[in-house]
């Protein structure tokens, strides 16, 4: 929330601000910090030195973002850094080093990697610093303090049951704290002087032990004792003290402190605040006085004076943004560059020793692709770099505003307990208490509240100042989780109380992480907006306060799954945030300058002001990651005058600058012949032929033509039906605009048969010799569905483009340096076996499919009410109102009271009142104005609509909110009045065309030889447990035997059964055990159990033992 003092108004911050600010901070400051802190590298003789300059350059991308999507490339910029080589402290030579490519973030806060949009999810980890805890055991209490370093290392101090103080290195290794003190260079006088609670050391005989004093008097001796107590002994279980061993242990101890005791600036800040220290923030390593203060406070906690920490509190957690993650990866890449340069210098020194003369530094590789490799690995494999959910614009924003508790340095799904997943009071105004995934990640993935911001790694929330003694301070104050503990903050779902009403003198307030009722005079701050606590998805749900939290969670998640419809429609009932979501999504085309529209068509808008021409390119039928349509429709006519910031074109699922995810349709809550039982939904055929829920989906087909393998693209495909090739042009490519069916060829390809084909099928060689056929094989690309071809992209694969190197020539003095970098870059690509002649070609075919709603599709509302279409009724059979209008959808009324999402009823009735071209924008928690405010508003609007339309059935006093409707089949009135109205219904991405899957034969598991599970593996057709129960209930023994043996996992029998079915013969019996039975016997054998059976002859009663 931002406050403009001149206009005295508040504005909600941009929803993508956190991502954009984080990446800008990485480019401007974090990269600079890495190059400034890059150490000077020198050889052993100090003859050659290398160091980076801080004036790095990032070249503008040579390709547009749209072209990078088509060519499946990464939208990135090349990074060039000046470096200096100093020879014998005299000769100084400057070189420009190419360090790789850095992917760029677009205006939506996402990255384009290999033609796919990806997003880096923010992470919440434990903040570096010191944390105190109490472990209760049967024998007594153990007080511990854990020091978390900046790189994630931990150091644990503890007071055991016997009041002894230890530093624990691992679970089984601990050292006395006094030994650690002496190893850090302290003596007994300094320890006693700087420790307030000296009684904590009285239990030790160490202070009075003269022998131990003498042994620990020297620092190296203390370090020796430190590792001796850790158990670092040789094979003979004895330490042999020597100077070389002492030096080795000293280096080991120094490395130990640098790895586990590096606090960083944030850790130093937290340590100073917790222990009341005054050490500068630039001192990022642990000091001896820090350890003294840590132990002193630990003793204080054991006496009950200090307080233990709650690790789930947000003040103890750090927000890891995209800048922090990228900075960490660049640091790893620069470390590899450092090793590369050191190895090169060692090679030069060896050459110098062999030739016995001074050698100038030869061609050190002026190109290093370490940053490219590291960032490629990060964006491709890191768990926080995720494939962008792009079903609609709301899904993009919500995905970029997610915060993960998982990932490196965070929690794990298995070890995260209920306490870590639960809602903490410090989340108030920072994390949404509702929006989280369903399933095993529940509580581990959070979503930012709409007004939260990041400051120095911590989340802050704005509050309005109402205290009289703070009137001269700012009206809007951002408080961190550690600051709002000391203030009384009134909740946002209440208004300024009327002191004349005794019942309203106390206000619900948050104070010291608890929710209390406090008088208004004692309030310091208050929330300024009821939506301040929630995420964007939850804030779009009207009448949110009347829904159960779990249903609000489902409604928020299902809005992300809504498919953009062909004809978007504004919701009649909303919350007022729809325009802000559309504006910040990046899907709108916004005017960048004031002027008059000179030219406008479906793809381009040109505006002119005082001779300055601005051209805006629109998205035309582009594919998203979820195969939905991304398209912009212009509503800026020619010669129209526009202002800066005015909307020129709407994006997908948008209308008039507002996000429109669904359609306003007429619904009724009533049972209908059992077709809407449970979550089934009955719809009218009007939704189909009026294209109410019709959506476009774009599928991308891709194929590669490798000319190195003599693969070619052609229309002449032998032994293939001409009908399937009817859409190909002379080059073998499908024509744009063609209507293709499943099985039609999109790209005609031929390649020579390999030697493996002839060895696998010898008859191919015989046919070639007999009939003189050409040894070729068709590898055509075929369509899997029907649709219209809207685009064909035929491009050649190139390893890189050197044109952007020329853009670095900003100074004449550096032109020759960039020429050297260009030559070195070409050498590196040749060494990596990149073929610069581009011997491969790639073809992308985009198929547009128009999908109407049908049986099996999933639809939902914004209140967690979801269901599957079970039947499509004709218009005349649908129930109709007293005005003759037939219903569009019939929902089950039993789904409302059991799930406690009454908000859909308020929306439905208010939507009926808003059919007279009215739109309502109602923020949640309107009950803060008066009791039953929502109900009064709905009934009042219904009463007004009844009078304006002269339809008394809209508002009937006998049954408020209900009306009598007629059966479309008989024309009779239903016995009971029914709740009817206009609800905003969404069509979800879960559609029957994508879910339907069937197979006859397919892949089998290697061990059990049973069909694999899942559509993605090509599996299916399994006889499950419930199907076996059904067969058992009917007693079909022979069918059960077939299904469980010869038709399941008997390899030889299931091959014979197909032939027997075709020939009409009886089903063959299994002559041996099935594969799953063999697996069972082997598992029993592994348990030392032998499985066998015995046959008893009926005539002679002989025993014949047969092993399985």
From Swiss-Prot:
Listed GO CC annotations: chloroplast; DNA-directed RNA polymerase complex; mitochondrion
Keywords: Chloroplast, DNA-directed RNA polymerase, Nucleotidyltransferase, Plastid, Transcription, Transferase
Protein localization: Plastid, Chloroplast
A molecular-function term among this protein's GO annotations: ribonucleoside binding
Presence of keyword Protease: no
Pfam families the record matches: RNA_pol_Rpb2_2 (PF04561), RNA_pol_Rpb2_3 (PF04565), RNA_pol_Rpb2_6 (PF00562), RNA_pol_Rpb2_7 (PF04560)
Keyword Methyltransferase: no
EC number of the protein: 2.7.7.6
Catalytic activities: RNA(n) + a ribonucleoside 5'-triphosphate = RNA(n+1) + diphosphate
Catalytic EC class: transferase
GO terms (BP aspect): DNA-templated transcription
Family annotation (SUPFAM superfamilies): beta and beta-prime subunits of DNA dependent RNA-polymerase
UniProt subunit comment: In plastids the minimal PEP RNA polymerase catalytic core is composed of four subunits: alpha, beta, beta', and beta''. When a (nuclear-encoded) sigma factor is associated with the core the holoenzyme is formed, which can initiate transcription.
Biological role: DNA-dependent RNA polymerase catalyzes the transcription of DNA into RNA using the four ribonucleoside triphosphates as substrates.
Homology family: Belongs to the RNA polymerase beta chain family.
PANTHER family on file: DNA-DIRECTED RNA POLYMERASE I SUBUNIT 2
Protein name: DNA-directed RNA polymerase subunit beta
Organism: Gnetum parvifolium (Small-leaved jointfir)
GN (gene name): rpoB
């Amino acid at each position: 929330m931002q406050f403009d003092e001149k206009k005295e108004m508040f504005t909600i911050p941009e929803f993508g601000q956190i991502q954009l600010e984080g990446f800008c901070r990485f480019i401007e400051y974090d990269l600079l910090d890495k190059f400034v802190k890059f150490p000077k590298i020198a050889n052993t003789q100090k003859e050659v030195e290398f160091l980076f300059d801080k004036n790095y350059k990032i070249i503008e991308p040579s390709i547009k973002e749209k072209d990078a999507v088509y060519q499946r490339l990464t939208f990135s910029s090349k990074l060039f850094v000046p470096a200096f080589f100093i020879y014998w402290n005299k000769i100084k030579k400057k070189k420009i080093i190419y360090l790789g490519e850095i992917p760029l973030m677009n205006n939506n806060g996402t990255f384009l990697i290999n033609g796919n949009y990806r997003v880096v999810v923010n992470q919440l980890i434990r903040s570096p610093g010191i944390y105190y805890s109490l472990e209760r055991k049967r024998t007594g209490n153990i007080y511990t303090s854990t020091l978390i370093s900046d790189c994630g290392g931990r150091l644990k101090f503890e007071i055991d049951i016997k009041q002894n103080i230890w530093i624990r290195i691992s679970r089984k290794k601990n050292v006395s704290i006094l030994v650690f003190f002496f190893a850090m260079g302290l003596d007994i006088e300094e320890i006693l002087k700087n420790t307030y609670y000296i009684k904590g050391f009285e239990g030790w005989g160490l202070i009075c032990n003269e022998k131990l004093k003498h042994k620990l008097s020297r620092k190296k001796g203390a370090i020796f004792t430190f590792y001796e107590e850790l158990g670092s002994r040789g094979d003979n279980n004895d330490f042999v003290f020597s100077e070389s061993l002492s030096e080795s242990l000293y280096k080991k101890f120094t490395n130990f402190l640098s790895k586990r005791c590096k606090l960083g600036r944030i850790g130093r800040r937290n340590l100073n605040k917790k222990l009341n220290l005054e050490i500068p923030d630039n001192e990022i390593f642990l000091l001896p006085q820090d350890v003294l203060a840590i132990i002193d406070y630990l003793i204080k906690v054991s006496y009950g004076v200090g307080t233990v920490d709650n690790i789930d509190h947000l003040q103890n957690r750090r927000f890891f943004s995209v800048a922090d993650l990228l900075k960490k990866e660049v640091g790893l890449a620069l470390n590899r560059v450092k090793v590369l340069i050191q190895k090169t210098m060692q090679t030069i020194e060896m050459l110098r020793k062999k030739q016995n003369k001074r050698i100038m530094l030869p061609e050190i590789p002026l190109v290093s692709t370490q940053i490219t490799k590291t960032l490629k690995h990060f964006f491709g494999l890191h768990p926080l770099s995720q494939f962008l959910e792009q079903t609609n614009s709301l899904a993009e924003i919500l995905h970029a505003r997610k915060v993960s508790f998982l990932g490196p340095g965070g929690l794990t799904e298995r070890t995260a307990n209920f306490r870590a997943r639960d809602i903490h009071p410090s989340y108030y105004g920072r994390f949404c208490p509702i929006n989280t995934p369903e399933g095993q990640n529940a509580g581990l993935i959070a979503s930012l509240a709409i007004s939260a911001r990041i400051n120095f790694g911590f989340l802050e929330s704005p509050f309005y100042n109402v205290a009289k003694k703070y009137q001269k301070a700012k009206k809007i104050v951002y408080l961190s989780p550690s600051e709002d503990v000391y203030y009384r903050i009134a909740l946002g779902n209440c208004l300024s109380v009327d002191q004349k009403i005794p019942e309203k003198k106390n206000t619900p307030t948050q104070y010291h992480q608890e929710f209390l009722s406090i008088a208004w005079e004692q309030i310091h701050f208050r929330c300024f907006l009821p939506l301040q606590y929630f995420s964007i998805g939850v804030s779009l749900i009207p009448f949110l306060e009347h829904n159960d939290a779990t249903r609000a969670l489902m409604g928020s998640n299902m809005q992300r799954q809504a498919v953009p419809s062909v004809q978007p429609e504004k919701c009649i009932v909303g919350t007022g945030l729809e325009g802000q979501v559309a504006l910040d999504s990046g899907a709108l085309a916004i005017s960048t300058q004031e002027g008059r529209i000179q030219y406008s068509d479906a793809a381009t808008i040109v505006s002119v002001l005082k001779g300055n021409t601005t051209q805006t390119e629109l998205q035309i039928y582009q594919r998203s990651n979820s195969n939905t349509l991304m398209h912009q429709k212009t509503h800026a006519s020619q010669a129209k005058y526009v202002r800066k910031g005015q909307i020129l074109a709407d994006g997908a699922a948008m209308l008039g600058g507002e996000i429109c995810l669904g359609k306003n349709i007429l619904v009724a809550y009533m049972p209908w012949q059992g077709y809407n039982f449970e979550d089934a939904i009955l719809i009218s055929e009007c939704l189909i032929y009026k294209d109410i829920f019709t959506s476009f989906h774009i599928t991308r087909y891709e194929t590669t033509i490798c000319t190195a393998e003599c693969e070619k693209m052609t229309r002449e495909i032998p032994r293939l039906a001409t009908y399937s090739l009817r859409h190909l042009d002379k080059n073998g490519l499908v024509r744009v605009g063609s209507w293709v069916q499943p099985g039609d060829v999109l790209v005609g390809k031929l390649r020579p048969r390999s030697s493996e084909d002839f060895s696998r099928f010898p008859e191919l060689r015989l046919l070639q010799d007999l009939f003189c056929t050409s040894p070729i094989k068709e590898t055509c690309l075929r369509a899997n569905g029907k649709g219209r071809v809207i685009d064909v992209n035929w491009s050649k694969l190139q390893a890189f483009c050197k044109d952007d190197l020329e853009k670095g020539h900003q100074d004449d003095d550096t032109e020759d340096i960039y020429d050297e970098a260009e030559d070195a870059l070409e050498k590196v690509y040749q060494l990596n076996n990149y073929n610069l002649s581009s011997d491969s070609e790639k073809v992308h075919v985009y198929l547009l499919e128009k999908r109407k709603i049908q049986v099996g599709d999933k639809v939902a509302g914004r209140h967690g009410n979801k269901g599957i279409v079970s039947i499509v009724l004709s218009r005349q059979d649908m129930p109709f109102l007293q005005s003759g209008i037939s219903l569009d959808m019939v929902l089950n009324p039993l789904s409302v009271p059991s799930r406690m999402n009454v908000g859909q009823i308020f929306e439905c009735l208010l939507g009926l009142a808003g059919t007279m071209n009215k739109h309502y924008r109602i923020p949640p928690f309107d009950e803060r104005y008066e009791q039953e405010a929502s109900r009064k508003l709905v009934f009042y609007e219904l009463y007004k609509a009844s009078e304006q339309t002269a339809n008394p059935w809209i508002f009937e006093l006998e049954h408020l909110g209900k009306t009598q409707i007629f059966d479309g089949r008989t024309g009779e009135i239903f016995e009971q009045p029914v709740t009817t109205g206009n609800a905003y219904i969404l069509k979800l991405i879960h559609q029957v065309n994508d879910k339907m899957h069937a197979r006859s034969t397919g892949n089998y598991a290697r061990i059990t030889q049973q069909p694999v599970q899942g559509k993605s593996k090509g599996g299916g057709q399994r006889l499950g447990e419930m199907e076996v129960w059904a067969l058992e209930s009917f007693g079909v023994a022979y069918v059960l035997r077939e299904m469980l043996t010869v038709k399941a996992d008997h390899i030889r029998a299931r091959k014979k059964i197909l032939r027997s079915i075709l020939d009409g013969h009886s089903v063959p019996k299994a002559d041996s055990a099935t594969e799953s039975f063999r697996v069972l016997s082997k598992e029993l054998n592994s348990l030392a159990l032998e499985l066998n059976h015995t046959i008893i002859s009926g005539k002679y009663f002989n025993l014949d033992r047969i092993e399985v």
